[in-house]
């Protein structure tokens, strides 16, 4: 994927916004950015959309902007000129698709059938929009279509919310979802920016699904590791499962290293729904990663260590 689509994938959730006033543009986008979502699909459902895109692009250059509900060639041109990095439509219009692609833009046409998706792919659309997602069969439908259209990638909007977001993002051909649950129109009208920031943070946390995987404890040698494992197992009535380089206790809650491993005292594994997205979002919070430790499988990162220890423990992210 190109760099814009890579960033869409990393961010994962793209807020969909219909501005009522240009005055809402900057404070809303700042609230989203503060909540960890530096992206927006600004819909052409309102007259001020073009002006809002231009203002955000000029004042918040780190905000990834898409234009949504683009129905005509003229709207597409105006959106791209204003600073939109990608164009989204509710339906599949070959004329608009071809025009945007011919101008070097990124087009995500709305599709609901495999026929529309195939036509869009053949026109050069790398990612298509699945809309309205829930009303059209949701992720189960896409899994059936994806078995045939293996190179098709989707951004899903329409009925996506905090309860089902990971059902969508858990399918590897879906690069992102769009939604409004973190920036409802009533909150925007009320100027409830702090609430929007809080809901955006919660959306990111739900998406990442960070949780403790296991604790690794360094030992000097195999004998010390065996003794440590037996001690923990007896205290907690857990099973011991010896391995080549370590001994697991319980359901792998503890990993006892047979020789000193990474970290002064050991390591802590944090599980996540998507390591690549976690790297992006935690980096925005100031976390630094040891990129040489990255473990990649089938094009996706499955594990990576933080650059710095915490209280003598190395920390690594691990794919669930």
Where is each model-derived feature located?
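Core segments of cupin and vicinal oxygen chelate
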Residues: 28, 45-47, 216-254, 284, ...
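Glycine-rich phosphate-binding active-site loops on the catalytic face of alpha/beta enzymes
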Residues: 90-96, 129-139, 173-196
